[in-house]
Amino acid sequence: MNENDNGAKDWLSNADMLTEALPYMQKYADSIIVIKYGGHAMKDTKSIKSFCEDIALLKQSGLKPVIVHGGGPQIGNMLEKLGIETKFESGMRITDDKTLEIVEMVLCGGINKEIASNINNCGCKAVGLSGKDASMIIAKKHDGKIKDESNIEKIVDLGFVGIPEKINTDIIEILTSNDFIPVIAPLGISEDGKTFNINADTVA
């Protein structure tokens, strides 16, 4: 099978998916939809580009996508390169000052901008931001209550791991109503100005 055959196959596959999705697109036209894009799905540049093309299609079909992205594997890779040890408790990364700095750098300075740029290249208008911007996500420190492998609850200091306390949707509504696609990194800020790393699933 040559490259043209592969292209035709991809086109037909996309056309079939679009046909199936059309009734839902029509039903939810002009509605805000929140999509979580996990770090494990960002396997390579091609995967990110394909995801962004799908987001552009949703936007052009009348929906208002809002992207909340993760970045766990990418953060882990960067920490490893810098020789910073990573510890987890029940799937949550224990986040000290140094780790938080890397988390913010990777999420906001790397992944966030790459997703927004790829969406823009698809002809849509994306804006990259984090939950700290305009105090969008007011967070508080995670209480550290987790369950171990034996399902026994214990309390662990997770450092700067937080949970959302309040979501200020004003900036999201302003952006989506003006034809922009918000791309949000899952960081939050506390009432006293502390930055917290938040699970993207929780934010979405």
What does each model-found stretch correspond to?
Residues 1-204:
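Nucleotide/pyrophosphate-binding catalytic subdomain
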